[in-house]
């Protein structure tokens, strides 16, 4: 009986000392493949973000992916056979609720003109301007549109025209950078005063890629939300892709995505 009591005492002693091991008393989520704790500085400090899914960017709508018949579904009476119907699977994606309007593209031009205000970048500014002469055609009276459509406030919310594929692609890149820059400012990871000094920054302006690569030096402000921490549990003032805070790159939709959304599968 004394031996049993002695062994029980030893077991209780080990149980009581369990909390004294160099592992955190705080309950953590554990890895299903190793059993090690996530977000525990005493167990390697591997960080798992609480973010579960991507947030919706400004002006975007979520489109649930699926399968549809892409191409002509009616009889090809001309016999061209240049749009053969086929089943296509589309992954879920986000798309604008409406077309990019004149005012949105003028916002883009305004940023370029301020950021690249040195005369040496005149070609950069000119390359971004839309071709307003697309309204001109034989036997037409579209001169008022040539002069007013892009700039006049009455056409602010009309779709921008005269934009090439390259210009549209550059606009997407710019838009993604501006959205992510604002996210960092709102979280206190970039000082908002830097938004006031975009003039003349040129190649030194914020881009998502340069930020993630550590090439963009931003003066942080006080974090307004739950502070990010590093593997040692210390606060950090930079964001990684794994945090799930920044938006993915913006891009133009593929032909399949465009047709899928246009057919109303949203």
Where in this protein do the model-derived segments appear?
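Sec-dependent signal peptide recognition
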Residues: 2-7
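C-terminal motif of bacterial Sec signal peptides marking the signal peptidase cleavage site
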Residues: 14-16
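Bacterial lipoprotein signal-peptidase II cleavage site
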Residues: 18-24
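Active-site microenvironments of metalloenzymes and redox enzymes
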Residues: 19, 72, 93-266
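Post-signal peptide N-terminal segment of mature Sec-exported envelope proteins
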Residues: 24-53, 61
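Mature N-terminal segment immediately following signal peptide/propeptide cleavage
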Residues: 54-73
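Extracytoplasmic
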Residues: 58, 65, 85, 90-92, ...
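Short, polar loop/linker segments at the starts of domains and inter-domain junctions
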Residues: 72-90
């Amino acid at each position: 009986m004394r031996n049993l009591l002695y062994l029980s005492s030893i077991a209780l002693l080990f149980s009581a000392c369990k909390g004294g091991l160099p592992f955190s008393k705080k309950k953590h989520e554990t890895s299903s493949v190793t059993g090690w704790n996530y977000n525990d500085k005493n167990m390697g400090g591997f960080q798992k973000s609480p973010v579960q899914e991507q947030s919706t960017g400004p002006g975007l709508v979520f489109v649930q992916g699926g399968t549809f018949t892409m191409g002509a579904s009616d009889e090809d009476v001309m016999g061209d056979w240049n749009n053969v119907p086929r089943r296509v699977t589309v992954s879920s994606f986000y798309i604008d609720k409406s077309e990019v309007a004149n005012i949105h593209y003028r916002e883009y031009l305004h940023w370029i003109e301020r950021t690249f205000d040195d005369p040496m970048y005149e070609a950069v500014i000119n390359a971004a301007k839309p071709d307003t002469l697309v309204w001109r055609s034989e036997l037409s009276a579209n001169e008022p549109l040539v002069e007013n459509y892009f700039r006049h406030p009455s056409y602010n919310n009309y779709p921008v025209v005269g934009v090439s594929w390259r210009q549209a692609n550059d606009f997407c890149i710019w838009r993604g950078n501006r959205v992510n820059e604002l996210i960092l400012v709102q979280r206190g990871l970039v000082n908002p005063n830097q938004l006031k000094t975009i003039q003349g920054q040129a190649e030194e302006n914020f881009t998502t890629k340069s930020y993630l690569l550590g090439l963009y030096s931003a003066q942080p402000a006080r974090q307004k939300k739950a502070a990010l921490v590093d593997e040692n549990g210390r606060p950090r003032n930079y964001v990684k892709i794994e945090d799930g805070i920044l938006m993915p790159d913006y891009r133009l939709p593929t032909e399949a995505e465009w047709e899928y959304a246009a057919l109303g599968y949203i």
